Amino acid sequence: MRLPSGGIQTTGGGTTNATNLTVETNGNSSAAIRSDRGGGTVNVEKGTYTSKGYNSPAVYSTANITVKNAALTAENSEALVVEGKNSITLENCDVSGSMSDSKGTSSSENVHNVMIYQSMSGDAETGTANFSMTGGKLTSSNGDQFYVTNTDCNITLSGVTLVNKDKDGKLLRVTGNSASHGWGTAGKNGAQVTFTADAQTMEGDMEVDSISTLDLTLKNNSTFTGTIQIVDNADGGTAVENNAVVTIEKGSKWVLTGDCTITSLTNNGTIDFNGHTITLADGTVLKG
């Protein structure tokens, strides 16, 4: 059995500072930058950090990890993972991931580039996760750009270039899971996401299942081109309220590429309907 390892590894609440390193890992379950039980703080400035194995993100966080002005590449894995009450903060980084359809530990559940979740293994304290990226580029070669399950989290993007090479991949998927990996109880393991686009341009579809919630805010001249859909939980879980709440602040825009279903809408900006509709939870159908 191969135990998880990392190029830069922090455990037990320690603090690690690294500057302008070249780090490469080749084994499976070997993130280039990772933390383990006990949390801690990791600060990385500049450099190149590459993982080549399966189940080996460029960054796996069970701590508070900040990376600035660096290149982060996962050649056979999702790029980034946040587990539990922890965080990843990126500034002006070039990030790319290429998760396998079959060889990733969670490939049977979802293929993605950034995963935010609670594993229930005891590796990470339960609580609200945080992911923030300012500037730089985030490239996904396969699957969804963001996948969130069995946790609460805040996602903030500002001035990031987003690229998804998989035409079928979602920009964001917020759902429960089958619990086959121990991530909560099927039908009760949805996610709660607060997503803020701040001076951000983004394109792609968002999907939220009926046991999960999304609170999306577009601010500071952000533009979102895509759809939002509420879908049934695959395991028949009891639906919750406020599955998809959207706020568009002054100067920001939502460009629809298809019909949408959301719970409620506060619009002080602009919506380009392009012939499509938005259906609210109370049955109201909005048209251009």
Put a short name on every predicted segment.
Residues M1, S5-N28, R34-Y54, V59-N76, ...:
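Surface-exposed loop/turn motifs in large extracellular/passenger domains
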Residues S98, S212, N233-D235, T263-T266, ...:
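A short local loop/turn or secondary-structure capping micro-motif enriched for an aromatic residue
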Residues V240-V246, W254-T266, T279-A281:
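Surface-exposed loop/turn positions within long extracellular repeat scaffolds
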